[in-house]
Amino acid sequence: MLDPRGLARPSRFCPRIIYAGTSHIRRATAAALLAASLCALPACADVGVGAALPLSPDKLYGELFVAVQTAQVYPDQKTFVDTVPKADPAVILQAYRAQKDVPGFSLKAFVDQYFTVPFETVITPPAGQSLRAHINWLWPALTRTTATAPDNSSLIPLPKPYVVPGGRFREVYYWDTYFTMLGLQASGRDDLVDSMLDNFAYQINRFGHIPNGNRTYYLSRSQPPFFALMVELAATKEGEAAYTRYLAPLRKEYAYWMRGAAGTAPGQASGNVVVLPDGTVLNRYWDDEATPRPESYLQDVATAQQAPDRPAAEVWRDLRAAAESGWDFSSRWFGDSATLATIRTTSILPVDLNALMFQLEKTIAKGCAVARDFACTVEFGNHARKRAVAVERYLWHPAGYYADYDWKLGKVRDNLSAAATYPLFVQMAPWGRARQTLRQTQTALLQVGGLSTTTLHTQQQWDAPNGWAPLQWIALQASQHYGQALLAQTIGERFLGSVERLYAAEQKLVEKYIVDGSGTGGGGGEYPLQDGFGWTNGVTLRLLDAYGRGQ
């Protein structure tokens, strides 16, 4: 039965459900999720630009979604949410309810009948390519054009071409794209840089923010705000025109991240904003939903079960907020620095996010100056100065490095991570503290094959011994900004060595590396190691230009 907007009414999603293969999942948890994900079905938040958020697969398919993900019809939970329905969701649900209790019913056969499974493009490069030639060959293979999308698909169409990371990541990702752009620009593909900037501006205008990725199930959160740095990158080629062209979306993105700041009392939080007891305003990662992530449904249900003393919705929100951080998952977000079930992302003020917000404020001030809106220039210059003061007060560890702050516990966290170099990357750190941070980073994180993500081995992918291309670039640039060219070169050459060793052995680039010098791909995480790989390609090209010894 449909309501006037053509959406299935939530009351029809509440009959008895058979949970295939749920012996390891408490029925109470599954029922709670079903109520949370389905009874909110018709609620589409107004994004302020005349468009409602399209529904994600968990809301479109309700009990069928729960059954498919719980039964693990596909090994990867992301597969089902990326499928394309062959009929209207209401028709599919009606068929499911009619057939599910019939003897001999096969859920897998039903899904095969009604959904088209996404396929991963097999990339077979020519033999004997150099590393540089291989990356340049990959750009067209990783480029997608989806100006339209099938009805009720989770894919959000974008007006212009874009580059995907590769593997299971069949869509564009927000913060990945900055590092991909570094390589595209080095390859002379400024056309793609401009296209992706325009796509992000389109999403800001449509949704009010840049989603995690162009999928409906990513719309409830963003990712680290690199849009300002993308504009800065474009400005290196086209000059000041880039600032005026993207000034309006930059200001809209800032408004998104600062929602609720004016009306939040000291000691309270609202969305991505936290107001500390002294009135200082800083940002945190957040997600507007508090249910299991559709693309990782079963894992999130299991994690909440491992924290029986916490409301499941609280755990799920913190898992989602960690996904917004891009560091999913890491000891940075764990209460005990070791266990996923202790995750408390929304209680933490991250040093990287607040450095990026400083950059956003600076870029808006610069754009306003170019546009000769000097009142705006003063306003955002003041925002940036206040944030710099706040970062120095709250996000500095007495041991001599920048760190995250737990605003609920009222103390800086001890975890030293590669995120410590972000204030240096955006050039907001005083020289003395910058030098201290670089010394600590070099001593604790620099390995034979590059910079380790953290000092802790937790089996999570954003911890030791993994190293990630974007964090190498951030630390390298941070070192250069503060006069440490030799350290920058050491980081760059060591990580490039990791990439070269694996490429020599397997003829591919991957999303993360073990930086112990073995030349192997990184481990941990919720899925197998992916190759492609957008941001590794981008950073590697820049490293080849700087330290590639003629390659």
Swiss-Prot record:
Q: Which residues are recorded as binding substrate?
A: R168, W175, D176, N212, R221, S222, Q223, R293, P294, E295, G326, E526
* EC top class, as a word: hydrolase
One Gene Ontology cellular component term attached to this UniProt record is: periplasmic space
Entry's localization field? Periplasm
Q: Which UniProt keywords apply?
A: Glycosidase, Hydrolase, Periplasm, Plasmid, Signal
Catalytic site: D328 (proton donor/acceptor), E511 (proton donor/acceptor)
Leader sequence range is 1-45
Name the GO terms of the biological process aspect.
cellular hyperosmotic response; trehalose catabolic process
Q: What family does the database annotate?
A: Belongs to the glycosyl hydrolase 37 family.
The family database entries (PANTHER family) matched by this protein are listed as: TREHALASE
Q: Please describe what this protein does.
A: Provides the cells with the ability to utilize trehalose at high osmolarity by splitting it into glucose molecules that can subsequently be taken up by the phosphotransferase-mediated uptake system.
The name of this protein is Periplasmic trehalase
